Swiss-Prot record:
Name recorded for this polypeptide: Glucans biosynthesis protein D
Organism encoding this protein: Pseudomonas syringae pv. tomato (strain ATCC BAA-871 / DC3000)
GO cellular component labels: outer membrane-bounded periplasmic space
Lineage, uppermost ranks: Bacteria, Pseudomonadati, Pseudomonadota, Gammaproteobacteria, Pseudomonadales
GO molecular function, a single term: catalytic activity
GO annotation, biological process: beta-glucan biosynthetic process
Endpoints of the signal sequence: 1-29
Alphabetized UniProt keyword annotations: Periplasm, Signal
Pathway participation: Glycan metabolism; osmoregulated periplasmic glucan (OPG) biosynthesis
Family under the similarity heading: Belongs to the OpgD/OpgG family.
The keyword 4Fe-4S appears for this protein: no
Gene: opgD
Compartment annotation: Periplasm
Amino acid sequence: MNRRNLLKASMALAAYGSVSASGLYAARALAAAADGEIEHFDFAELQAHAKKLAGKGYVSNKQVLPPVLANMTPLQFNAIRYDPNHSLWKDVNGQLDVHFFHVGMGFKTPVRMYSVDPQNKQAREVHFRHDLFNYESSGIDKNLVKGDLGFAGFKLFKAPEIAINDVVSFLGASYFRAVDSNKQYGLSARGLAIDSYAKRQEEFPDFTKFWFETPDKNATRFVVYALLDSPSATGAYRFDIDCQAGQVVMEIDAHINARTDIQQLGISPMTSMFSCGTHERRMCDTIHPQIHDSDRLSMWRGNGEWICRPLNNPAKPQFSAFADKDPKGFGLVQSDHEFSSYQDTVVWYSRRPSLWVEPITAWGEGEVSLLELPTTGETMDNIVVFWTPKTPVKAGDSLNYGYKLFWSPLPPVSTPLAQVHATRSGMGGFLEGWAPGEHYPKTWARRFAVDFNGGGLDRLPEGTGIEPIVTVSHGKVQDFNILVLPDIKGYRITFDWVPDSDSVDPVEMRMFIRTGDRTLSETWMYQYFPPALDKRKYP
């Protein structure tokens, strides 16, 4: 602790006078890194402030960074390390701690951080200062970094890896992410999405302020509050973050206020990357069989139906909407965690978490929205998923959404029915077991193979009739095969899609399997993009 902090700590303790033991403890915790003036804070006041702010014009607080920060490389940015000796709760010496990110590169919006005593609801700001960071490995002359620049974001740590491996990160706009038992970051969540696929440019709201409740020594949950601001909306958020051994669970209370009419409001948005997988090989001319952070969108609809929608890397942007009422959950899933499926020893796609949303308030009518963008590499996120309310959002509207986020290898819930294990696609029009080269089919077709397992498929009596129920938006399906797959204790359904016109419109496919009147599986949904007429031929 430097002299400035020591002096402020002494003044703060004197100001408390005859406070309780818990009050003295909290005062010491606040003084560890927080050096601002004491302010009152509670969530109700934050909600009121956000609502009042929405009634005023938007004022951007992006700052012009000094060239030494604005022109940093990613390597330099990552080399600036927060000094763990100045961590927010260093003096607590407990199970939890917080470090902050330096501003720089594209992270130009100053984010203000506050430490809160939950006992007396007093808060103090943590101001940016040089001694909070180590610049030695970055090549940055800290003497050129002047003024209170704020922070770019923060990361959370939990014992026994405090100051070693962070488990949650908030950085840039309203983006945040977490790890699971595999200790590997993957897809991201956001506080709010605005006009992701609308007639006007997408808007990226910012979390501009955060408040951290000082925990007790033995506490294992973070409580964080946030103020969100953008040209079209404001928001007050409460995050209850439980970093468990196998997953991170966040309970979120979001209060959103519209400044303007919003064409497309995205609640609980998540962003991921899908380049290629078992069914999509267009961008996979590498040694890696698959490249993706997530391979499917999974939905548990309000009526109880489970849907699996494999992701695509389309040639042009595609938007899909799945209407629902009071959804039970949805998320982007990384279903395959086998190293052999990726052969990646650098970014470890086999270790990427899934992200599942569980509404805990009534969300009403709306749709799960899926935006798939073309990407030529693995460094660009191209998948966006969010909930859009059915009722148009008008200026002055206030909305409240409560939900949980589960960052885990697989979602915490699953259907009791059989699930989609994998989807594959390739040349059609021939018998299984035939290899191309000797001759080619006369009629062009596209073959699909969908594997199902679980749900007791391996316990069905011998001779049970399995019937695939398939519908397509155009074209026709034929040449069905039902194959037993002992290795996955399930079944493979293959069929060919044959065009009935020269249309290149996407084909919306839907399938489940049943025996008699009994449904055996979740619903597989897929979007296929037929080639142009002159491409529908074999060599």
